[in-house]
Amino acid sequence: MNISNINNDIYLGGLGNHSTEEIKNFLIDNNIKCIITIWNFNKLNIKKLNINVKDYMYIHAYDLTNEIIIDYFDITNKFIINKIKEGKKVLIHCYAGISRSASIVINYFMNKYNINYDEAEKIVSKKRNIKPNIFFILQLKFYNSYKNINIIYLIILFAIRYTLK
């Protein structure tokens, strides 16, 4: 299977050339109960994979340099965090497991560890060959900067409010 274990809870891969039976066997063998699909094909047949509808997220996205994926960063992070809290492993996949799904996993690690793109990319690339397209990289860097700007803004507001008391 074209899937890599990134850490105890996160698997990253490409399912483009695998049958439903191969996928099902891999999920069973690795005790994976949750899936995020991010590609421009049909949803996976989760009934045949024995995946609960609440444990499946589908995002229709192309691997193109004009595709907007930043809108999905918050919801995928929440999904992954919640499923891990439930004690479930999560597979994040696209067609090849190199760009779209890798971007989702990089974003997860950026948020989990409060690190920048380069640090998160290193964590993921140690376990799997990845190459997010340049526009996905720009979105990841922007998202991380924007998130940090909001934190700085809140700290300044708190400091001003505290000073005025």
UniProtKB/Swiss-Prot annotation:
It is an enzyme of class 3 (hydrolase). SMART domains: DSPc (SM00195). It catalyses: O-phospho-L-tyrosyl-[protein] + H2O = L-tyrosyl-[protein] + phosphate. The keyword rRNA processing does not apply. GO terms for molecular function: MAP kinase tyrosine phosphatase activity; MAP kinase tyrosine/serine/threonine phosphatase activity; protein tyrosine/threonine phosphatase activity. Its EC number is 3.1.3.48. The keyword Oxidoreductase does not apply. Residues 2-149 form the Tyrosine-protein phosphatase domain. Keywords: Hydrolase, Protein phosphatase. One of its GO terms (biological process) is negative regulation of MAPK cascade. InterPro entries: Dual-sp_phosphatase_cat-dom (IPR000340), Prot-tyrosine_phosphatase-like (IPR029021), Tyr_Pase_AS (IPR016130), Tyr_Pase_dom (IPR000387), TYR_PHOSPHATASE_DUAL_dom (IPR020422). The active site is at residue 94. It holds the Pfam family DSPc. Belongs to the protein-tyrosine phosphatase family. Non-receptor class dual specificity subfamily. This is Putative tyrosine-protein phosphatase AMV078. It comes from Amsacta moorei entomopoxvirus.
